[in-house]
Regions:
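N-terminal core-binding DNA-recognition domain of tyrosine site-specific recombinases/integrases
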Residues: 1-33, 152-157, 171-176
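Short, basic/aromatic-rich helical patch in the C-terminal catalytic core of site-specific tyrosine
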Residues: 5, 28, 32, 94, ...
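Basic, Lys/Arg- and aromatic-enriched nucleic-acid-binding interface segment
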Residues: 18-27, 37, 41-95, 178
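Short alpha-helical segment immediately N-terminal to, or the first helix within
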Residues: 12, 83-84, 184-188
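Exposed loop/turn and edge beta-strand positions of beta-sandwich/beta-sheet ligand-binding modules
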Residues: 77, 122, 168, 176
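Conserved tyrosine-mediated DNA breakage-rejoining catalytic core shared by Y-recombinases
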Residues: 51, 87, 96-135
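Active-site/catalytic core of tyrosine-dependent DNA strand-transfer enzymes
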Residues: 129-172, 180-181
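Short, polar N-cap/turn motifs at the start of nucleic acid-interacting alpha helices
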Residues: 101-105, 171, 188-189
Length: 189
């Protein structure tokens, strides 16, 4: 009966997320519609039950990223994290950089033998942030790949093992740096 369907909806709402309840009720409503087609004399008990469920999307909390000058640590990981912070580039783009990609005033994001780009429009140049200049001077002295250890042969991907250390050390994922850069650019327009 309709009362049973309403009671079931209430029971689900006590135990599950409202959006999950809506999905389950929509599935049951579809099944009940088929039943009503096969037996025209039956009543559709699930029709309209979803209309009274309000789904409130939780707002993501704002992430505060500490300034790189306060980061603790050294080595390849921290160098890559600084590049991510100041460029907004993708992790694979930075992890697969070559010394030849570091010019005096900009960083070239371009495909190389081991690292294709995500899309054809990903090829670009990024101005060098003043706080990256000293690091770039040292890195420019290298030959070939800047961080060859970041390449994973089995998956043919760059920087795949950096997400967890980044989250653990800095409280943000590599993608979070890219999102932050986009937000900063939008707010400065």
């Amino acid at each position: 009966t309709k009362q049973h369907a309403i009671a079931y909806r209430s029971w689900l709402l006590e135990r599950l997320n409202p959006s999950t309840v809506k999905t389950q009720l929509a599935f049951l409503s579809g099944l009940w519609s088929v039943l009503c087609e096969l037996r025209p004399d039956s009543t559709h008990v699930f029709r309209g039950l979803n209309k009274r469920i309000k789904v409130v999307k939780a707002r993501k909390s704002d992430i505060t990223i500490t300034d790189p000058s306060q980061w603790e640590g050294a080595g390849d990981e921290m160098e890559i994290f600084q590049f991510l912070f100041f460029t907004g580039a993708r992790l694979a783009e930075i992890a697969g950089l070559q010394a030849e990609d570091l010019l005096e005033d900009r960083i070239l994001i371009r495909p190389n033998v081991l690292r294709p780009l995500k899309t054809s429009s990903s090829e670009r140049s990024i101005p060098i942030h003043p706080r990256l200049k000293t690091l770039i001077v040292d890195l420019r002295k290298k030959n070939g790949l800047l961080w060859p250890a970041q390449y994973q042969e089995s998956s043919k991907r760059w920087g795949v093992n950096l997400s967890k250390p980044c989250r653990k050390m800095l409280g943000i994922t590599p993608k979070g740096f890219r999102d932050r850069a986009a937000t900063v650019l939008r707010s400065n327009n």
